[in-house]
Regions:
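Non-heme di-metal
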Residues: 1-333
Length: 333
């Protein structure tokens, strides 16, 4: 697969796109999932009602493009590419000592393979490896094909990173090692992001595949479809690994305290899901409004475009109050 004159991962067999690093990874994930099924352990998953729609939505983004206000859409697609590049950080996750921090054996599980290949394969998929491009470069190519090589604002990364210093994280389960809790938080966050991304893929394929607003609809939509296929094993292995840990007993740093894996995983999952499904959409709304006013120099027209843009908002809100406990949907492995 070559995009923007960059050799990317993956390729074609008889004209069909084949994702990279799947010959061993995909059957291994199926086997680990089957072991959960045989043991009658469920898979944790995110209920669809908790998944916020992409912002801006298709109608909003198409409206901007038809109005000639391309920059906000360019920014949105560029941010996706940048965030994909950040995915390389998953290789830096420090995996705890499962032999001393989990009561039951993890032999023959996805957990046992996180540090020996799964995290590294995930990182290479997202950010590329050596001279091969990954999803970062593929998103950039889809953007450039669909929007006809738009001018990229030079402040996208700066504005993305200027949200202020992150608050000091309060330990959720201080009984556990810092490494165990940090790994769980990272894996949960990435799984939530990857699950939310399914709506982003559908949005991008529809928008960039729309001949009314896309310069190269077939090529742009195809690249996004390739990325979507590549992401499937990410969701699958993270789901399986977290479900494996959920079915086990975690041992505290004192070597004596034990915690139910289900209690810990469900607690982390509920907390992170609520935060990401409420904060991220609001941030996207605020950023989109600011982007419109940056892109349109005429203040009166900018206000008019922004109002019409808001009228096309789907109005989605998170379905639970802050004091309500979230459902954690479990399904058969």
């Amino acid at each position: 697969l070559v995009t923007n004159e960059i050799q990317c991962h993956g390729g074609y067999v008889d004209g069909d796109y084949v994702s990279p690093r799947g010959a061993l990874r995909r059957p291994a994930i199926r086997n680990w999932r089957e072991r959960l099924s045989v043991a009658d352990h469920p898979l944790i998953t995110i209920p669809e009602k908790y998944v916020p729609p992409n912002y801006p939505n298709y109608d909003q983004a198409k409206y901007l493009l038809q109005e000639g206000v391309v920059e906000p859409v360019t920014r949105a697609l560029t941010i996706i590419a940048i965030v994909e590049g950040f995915g390389a950080r998953i290789r830096e996750v420090s995996v705890p000592n499962f032999d001393t921090e989990v009561e039951e054996s993890v032999e023959g599980t996805a957990l046992a393979h996180l540090a020996s290949g799964l995290f590294e394969a995930h990182a290479r998929d997202e950010a590329g490896h050596r001279d091969q491009g990954g999803h970062k470069q593929m998103w950039e190519a889809a953007r450039d094909a669909g929007l006809d090589n738009p001018e990229i604002p030079d402040d996208v990364l700066l504005r993305l990173m200027s949200g202020g210093s992150p608050a000091t994280r309060k330990r959720l389960y201080p009984e556990l090692s810092e490494r165990m809790e940090s790994m769980l938080l990272m894996m949960t966050n990435v799984l939530i992001i990857e699950t939310f991304a399914e709506d982003t893929f559908n949005w991008a394929k529809k928008l960039l595949g729309d001949p009314e607003v896309s310069a190269e609809p077939e090529q742009a939509a195809h690249i996004v479809d390739c990325i979507a296929r590549d992401e499937v094993p990410h969701v699958d292995y993270l789901t399986v690994a977290l479900s494996e840990l959920r079915a086990r007993t975690l041992i505290g740093v004192d070597g004596k305290t034990t915690l139910s894996g289900a209690e810990v995983i469900d607690g982390v999952f509920r907390r992170q899901l609520r935060g990401m499904a409420t904060v991220r959409p609001q941030q996207s709304r605020e950023r989109s409004q600011a982007d419109i006013h940056l892109a349109v120099s005429d203040k009166r027209r900018a206000s008019s475009v922004a109002r019409q843009f808001e009228e096309l908002d789907s109005g989605w809100t998170f379905p639970h109050r802050d004091d309500e406990e979230l459902d954690v949907l479990l399904k058969s492995a």
